Amino acid sequence: MTTDTHTLHIEEILELLPHRYPFLLVDRVLDFEEGRFLRAVKNVSVNEPFFQGHFPGKPILPGVLILEAMAQATGILAFKSVGKLEPGELYYFAGIDEARFKRPVVPGDQMIMEVTFEKTRRGLTRFKGVALVDGKVVCEATMMCARSREA
């Protein structure tokens, strides 16, 4: 149970995101303000299945999973800002722009994702995201998500 209204623990994250192991990439929400920003954490463990092949002897978190972790953080911010979806509605990852990778993320790192709301237009919501390890930027991108009914 959360004692601070600006923190979300894993139980609350599981209520908001449809992702499950091994694809749930947000461990905890550290802080958020509805409609403005969210800070979340991903604890990177050598036990994650993708490290077996990426890369043997030199495990590095795949860049697409860093982006996915940031996208999941934007999804949580969207859910907390807009409220519960109607039955049959989902948030979809709709696009990414200006993605840049600055340094590798390795097992043992604690990756902080910071996402900020930019604007909503024509059903698309735009977010700016940055991922950090030890206060240093490892990735940054602009992401869009769309609210849509299931097909």
From Swiss-Prot:
- Name the top EC class: lyase
Report the InterPro entries cross-referenced here.
Answer: FabA_FabZ, FabZ, HotDog_dom_sf
Entry GO MF terms: (3R)-hydroxyacyl-[acyl-carrier-protein] dehydratase activity
| Pfam families for the chain | FabA
The protein's location, in the record's own words, is: Cytoplasm
Q: Might you name a Gene Ontology BP term for this protein? A: lipid A biosynthetic process
Q: Keyword Transmembrane, does the record have it?
A: no
Catalysed reactions, as listed in the record: a (3R)-hydroxyacyl-[ACP] = a (2E)-enoyl-[ACP] + H2O
Enzyme Commission number: 4.2.1.59
Question: A single GO CC term, please?
Answer: membrane
> Which positions, given as ranges, span the membrane?
none
UniProt keyword list: Cytoplasm, Lipid A biosynthesis, Lipid biosynthesis, Lipid metabolism, Lyase
- List, from the UniProt record, the residues annotated as the active site of this protein: H54
Question: What's this protein's family per the entry?
Answer: Belongs to the thioester dehydratase family. FabZ subfamily.
Q: What does this protein do?
A: Involved in unsaturated fatty acids biosynthesis. Catalyzes the dehydration of short chain beta-hydroxyacyl-ACPs and long chain saturated and unsaturated beta-hydroxyacyl-ACPs.
Q: What is this protein called?
A: 3-hydroxyacyl-[acyl-carrier-protein] dehydratase FabZ
Question: Origin organism of this chain?
Answer: Klebsiella pneumoniae subsp. pneumoniae (strain ATCC 700721 / MGH 78578)
